[in-house]
Regions:
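Hot-dog-fold acyl-thioester-processing enzymes
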Residues: 2-80, 144
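Hydrophobic residues in beta-strands and at strand termini
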Residues: 23, 88, 137-139
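Mid-chain, well-packed structural core segment of small domains
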Residues: 73-96
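HotDog/MaoC-like acyl-thioester-processing domains
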Residues: 1-15, 92-144
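Arginine residue identity/basic-tract feature
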Residues: 27, 69, 85, 89-90, ...
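Well-ordered beta-strand positions in beta-sheet-rich domains
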Residues: 20, 85, 132-136
Length: 144
């Protein structure tokens, strides 16, 4: 169980605890089969190479799931993910170690709701930041 984060206890610049994953073909194949994304570029090396890619690569659902783990693991059971956006700008291939991180970029109250904007990103050792992302979350306040 994740310790609950409260709006009152964070400030702009607060770091969201990150995590890393080593990517391998099995991890990619399991994710794409589980999400029924059977496009061969995610599991067939020859097909991926014929398309100009050096290897198979992770798909959109994989990235969304990893960011969901990052942000929802941080906000706790009483937090609420209101908006999420990501931009897949670079590829993540087998052999890459992906690191998911974030920080608080803004906090405010709107219509009585305690809101936090978060800058999130995924990076690997080859490309640096591969997927910049954004989340708007609602957090409980200690004063309530």
């Amino acid at each position: 169980m994740t310790k609950q984060v409260f709006w009152d206890d964070i400030d702009v610049g607060h770091k969201i605890p990150g995590y890393s994953l080593k990517i391998d073909p099995t991890r990619i194949a399991l994710q794409v089969s589980g999400s029924q994304d059977f496009y061969p570029v995610h599991h067939d090396l020859d097909f991926a190479k014929a398309g100009g890619h050096p290897d198979i690569f992770v798909n959109t659902g994989f990235m969304q799931g990893c960011f969901n783990r990052l942000i929802c693991g941080w906000i706790g059971d009483d937090g609420w993910l209101k908006k999420f956006r990501m931009e897949m700008r670079r590829m993540n291939f087998p052999g890459d170690t992906m690191t998911f991180q974030g920080k608080v970029s803004k906090k405010f109250i709107e219509d009585g709701e305690h809101l936090v904007e978060c800058e999130l990103w995924a990076e690997n050792e080859r490309e640096g930041v591969t997927t910049p992302s954004f989340a708007l979350v609602s957090l409980p306040a200690r004063s309530e």
